[in-house]
Amino acid sequence: MDEKRGAFMAEYNLEKQHSKGKLHAIERIDMLLDDETFQEIELVKDRHYDGVIMGSGEISGKKVFLYVQDFTYKGGTLGRYHGRKISYLLDMAMKQKCPVIGVIDSGGARIQEGVKALAKYGDIFFTFVW
C-alpha cells in the first residue's frame, strides 16, 4: 500500500468504520477490483480528495470506472468539489463506453455549502439520464 492510501486508512478511520460493521473506502475498492489495477483519477493535483475516491480499474479483466464515498471524511457528504469529481468521472466513462460503479456511503448534501452543493446532485442525475 502506498503512502497516500495509507493516509486514507489511518488507524482512526479504520477503527471508526469497522466499529460500525463497515469497510473503509479503500478496502471496498480493493475488494471490488482485480489486484493492482486501480488507477486513481485526480482533477487537481495535490487537492484534497473531498470524501470521494475515484478512478478506474478492472473486474475480471474488463475496464470499469468507480467512485467510492468515504464516510470518515465529513460523513461522506457531497459538496461542490465532491460532485464535480463524480460528474467528471461519469463523463470520462461515457466517452470510453465503460461501466461505472458508485459505492454510496454518504450523509447527503454538505449543507454548509448551500445550494451549490445540492446543485451537484442535479449535475450527476443529468449525466445518468442524458
Regions found by a protein language model. Name each.
Residues 1-130:
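Terminal-region recognition feature
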